[in-house]
Amino acid sequence: MLSFFTKNTLTKRKLIMLALAIVFTFFAFGLYFIPHDEISVFDFKLPALQYETTVTSLDNFLIGGSTTLYTATVNHEDLNEPKSHEIVMLLASDGNVGSFESNLLDDCFKNRIEYAKLQNYNFEFVNVSSLVVPPVWGKMPAILQTMRKYPSAKWIWWLDQDALIMNKNLSLQELFLSPAMLQKSLLREQPIINSFGEDNFRITPAAYSKEMIEQIQFLISQDHNGLNAGSFLVRNSRSIALLMDLLTDPSLADAGVVRHEQDLIGYFIQKHSQVASMVGILPQRFINAFHEGPPTMQWQEGDLALHFAGCWVENKCAELWTKYKDKII
C-alpha cells in the first residue's frame, strides 16, 4: 500500500511522521470520520468545538510576491452563502509563460478582474518565481499564503492561467458553492479515476447529507485521466492548510514518482480515507470545461470556465484563446 513512497528519498520514518501528522490533524480539530473503504461512504460527526482557522506563518522559502488585483467590498447584507466577499480567486505564476504569450497573460488578468468586480470576489496574484519548488508545485504554497492573507475568507478558487472565465454573470454560489447547490451538484456513486494505473478504489458517496456538505473542504473535477488541478476550490481551514503544507514537502516532488501535483492529490485521496472524506467531485464542466472532448467534458455556451489544458503542446494557446475570447458572455 505504501510502495508509492518507498523511494530512496523517503525514509520509513518520514512515512510514519506523515501519517501521524494527517491523523493528528483530523482528530485534533474535531473532524471525525468513520470510513467504509469498500465504497467510500462516510459517517460524519460534527466537530465538538470550533477552532481558530488562522494559518500560521510560512517558511520564508515558500513565500512569493503577493499582489491584490481586486479587493471585494465587504457586504454583511449579502444573502449568499458564502458571502461574495468571502471568496478569493487565485492565480500564481513564475513568469515563464512558455508558448502562452505574455499578452495572453495580460488578457487573463483582465478577464479575471472583470469577473471579480462583477461578482464582488477578491482576486489575488502570487509570483512564485522565487520559490524553491518546481512551478507546478507552487500552487500549494500560494494557496497557503493566500489563506493567511485572507483570514476571513471561506473559499479560495484556484484557476490556471490558461483558462478563460466564459460566463461572467454566473456566480460560484449560484452554480454550486452554496450549501444547497453543493448538495445537488456533487457526483454520486462515481469512481475517482486513478492516474496510477491501479484499479479505481474510491467511489463517491451515494448521497450527501447536510452534515457531510459542511465537512467538504476540497472541490475538484476529473477528466478521462483523473483529477485535474487546473481549477479547484479549497476551504480556508486548518485541515486544508495542513494538507497543502504536506503536499509542498520537497521530498514528495523530488521522489519523481508523480509528474504533477494533481497526481499526488489523487494518490492521497486514493490511499487516505480521511483526505478522501474532505473531497467533493464536481461535474467537469462546472469549473474546468475543455475545448474538446465528450459532452460531459467539452465547453458549451453558458458554462462558467474554459480551460485550454495542454494547449502549449501544439503551440495552440493563442489560437484557441482568440477563438473563444469572442464567445465570453
Swiss-Prot record:
Compartments, record wording: Golgi apparatus membrane
This protein's UniProt keywords: Glycoprotein, Glycosyltransferase, Golgi apparatus, Membrane, Signal-anchor, Transferase, Transmembrane, Transmembrane helix
Enzyme Commission number, as recorded: 2.4.1.-
Lumenal face residues: 36-329
TM region(s), chain numbering: 15-35
Residue intervals annotated with topology Cytoplasmic: 1-14
Record-linked Gene3D superfamilies: Spore Coat Polysaccharide Biosynthesis Protein SpsA, Chain A
Keyword Membrane: yes
A Gene Ontology BP annotation from the UniProt entry: protein N-linked glycosylation
GO cellular-component term (any): Golgi membrane
EC class: transferase
Main localization category: Golgi
Membrane topology classification: Single-pass type II membrane protein
Gene Ontology terms for molecular function: alpha-1,2-galactosyltransferase activity
Glycosylation sites per record: N127, N169
Family according to the record: Belongs to the glycosyltransferase 34 family.
Protein's recorded name: Probable alpha-1,2-galactosyltransferase gmh1
